[in-house]
UniProtKB/Swiss-Prot annotation:
PANTHER family assigned: 2-KETO-4-PENTENOATE HYDRATASE (PTHR30143:SF0), ACID HYDRATASE (PTHR30143)
Segments traversing the membrane: none
UniProt gene name: hpcG
Statement: the UniProt record of this protein carries the keyword Metal-binding: yes
A Gene Ontology term for the protein's cellular component: cytoplasm
Protein's recorded name: 2-oxo-hept-4-ene-1,7-dioate hydratase
Reported function: Transforms 2-oxo-hept-4-ene-1,7-dioate (OHED) into 4-hydroxy-2-oxoheptanedioate, a step in the 4-hydroxyphenylacetic acid (4-HPA) degradation pathway.
Pfam families in UniProt: FAA_hydrolase
Enzyme Commission number: 4.2.1.163
Record-linked Gene3D superfamilies: Fumarylacetoacetase-like, C-terminal domain
Catalytic activity: (4Z)-2-oxohept-4-enedioate + H2O = (4S)-4-hydroxy-2-oxoheptanedioate
Length: 267
């Protein structure tokens, strides 16, 4: 595993790429011995940089929750990242496209916690007991590293994505909040419209068989670092659609049926 100085240097590179709105060479090309543990250490350093600049931690995201995405990334479990206070947008927002590099939208459910959740041995039932409400959420993902390196043509790896805050860049909350036992969360479905055309559909059971399973997984994953999910935090449970590119001028409307809808426009 690399030393802390190296983790900080990599985090600073990613931070500069985000601020300059310019993709950089994949971290794993310059640091071929990087491990998953290194990647999360880089992510923690990146979060520390942001907090030092005045940001606050508002929650966490879970990604790569489908078997297909895990297989394509050559890992056997999800990944996770941090949600900061300046990442959140309201339903109906005009989202500044120029703030991002290659923004894409995913359909998710967010769990807002009323009680702390701590692993190990956290279960789906513990998640239900700790959750205040569940609300529709769109995750705005972005990439500060090239997907395909222009020089070598090598694709980025999961180490690059994890280091890059698991590709998170924004969150749009909306729709109707519900108590976790008000509906069978597995059967919550959504239709994603971009410019009036359905681009993606999905059902929440596609996230680890149940959207609350990802929250339990995260609590258990963070336990060795003596980190718990705190009351009031927002946890994005994972996407149940493929990501859809968001371009300047695009309007998104995502219909969650009984849970309402979320709309936003990229300007």
């Amino acid at each position: 595993m690399f030393d802390k100085h190296t983790h900080t240097l990599i985090a600073q590179r990613l931070d500069q790429a985000e601020k300059q709105r310019e993709q950089i060479r994949a971290i794993s090309l310059d640091y071929p011995e990087i491990t998953i543990e290194d990647a999360y250490a880089v992510q923690r350093e990146w979060v520390r940089l942001k907090i030092a600049e005045g940001r606050t931690l508002k929650g966490h995201k879970i990604g790569l929750t489908s078997k297909a995405m895990q297989a394509s990334s050559q890992i056997s479990e999800p990944d996770y990242g941090a949600l900061l206070d300046d990442m959140f947008f309201h339903d109906g927002s005009d989202i500044p496209t120029d703030r991002f590099i290659v923004p894409r939208i995913e359909v998710e459910l967010a769990f807002v916690l009323a009680k702390p959740l701590r692993g190990p041995n956290c279960t789906l039932f513990d998640v239900y007991n700790a959750t205040d409400y569940v609300i529709p959420a769109l995750e705005l993902i972005d990439a500060r590293c090239h997907n395909i390196d222009p020089e070598t043509q090598r694709p980025r790896k999961v180490f690059d994505t994890i280091s890059d805050n698991a590709a998170n860049a924004g969150v749009i909350l909306g729709g109707r909040p519900i108590k976790p036992d008000e509906l069978d969360l597995r059967w919550i479905s959504a239709l994603m419209y971009r410019n009036g055309v359905i681009e993606e559909t999905g059902v929440a059971a596609g996230v680890l068989n149940h959207p609350a399973n990802g929250v339990a997984w995260l609590a258990n994953k963070l336990a060795p670092y003596d980190v718990q999910l705190e009351a009031g935090q927002i946890i994005l449970g994972g996407s149940f659609t493929r990501p859809v590119p968001a371009r300047k001028g695009d309007t998104f409307h995502v219909d969650y049926g009984n849970m309402g809808s979320i709309s936003c426009r990229f300007v």
